[in-house]
């Protein structure tokens, strides 16, 4: 005849038999592990931001270069911030590379591949 405590082996419940539950020690271990991983994530994010995050945007010389690239106008040319709200049609969007083909050309009918036939 089996004993009453046969579902316990060496003080631990057998897996798959009866009710499985989390002990207080396991719950405390999971909680401590979660807190440690959260703290490590926060420290990692803080360190990454401190090392190189947003530093490039705060640099004045790079900020001016970014503004020139985005608005195609430089502050040295006498334009101020109010001129940056010019519509796209008024901007001169010439290709950067001279004699470059257009970025998009419509394909003619003779250039398309043959139709699929099973």
From Swiss-Prot:
Residues 78-118 are annotated as: Disordered. Expression is restricted to melanoma and melanocyte cell lines and retina. Residues 48-118 are cytoplasmic. One of its GO terms (cellular component) is trans-Golgi network. It is a single-pass type III membrane protein. Acylated. It is found in: Endoplasmic reticulum membrane; Golgi apparatus; Golgi apparatus, trans-Golgi network membrane; Melanosome. The keyword Transmembrane helix applies. It comes from the Eukaryota. Involved in melanosome biogenesis by ensuring the stability of GPR143. Plays a vital role in the expression, stability, trafficking, and processing of melanocyte protein PMEL, which is critical to the formation of stage II melanosomes. Interacts with PMEL. Interacts with GPR143. This is Melanoma antigen recognized by T-cells 1. It comes from Homo sapiens (Human).
């Amino acid at each position: 005849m089996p004993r009453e405590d046969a579902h316990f082996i060496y003080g631990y419940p057998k897996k798959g038999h009866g009710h499985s539950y989390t002990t207080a020690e396991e719950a405390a271990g999971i909680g401590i592990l979660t807190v440690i991983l959260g703290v490590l994530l926060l420290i990692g994010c803080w360190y990454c931001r401190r090392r190189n995050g947003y530093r490039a945007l705060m640099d004045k010389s790079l900020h001016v270069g970014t503004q020139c690239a985005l608005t195609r106008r430089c502050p040295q040319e006498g334009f101020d911030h109010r001129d940056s709200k010019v519509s796209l049609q008024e901007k001169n969007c010439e290709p950067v590379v001279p004699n470059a083909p257009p970025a998009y050309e419509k394909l003619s009918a003779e250039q398309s591949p043959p139709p699929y036939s099973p």
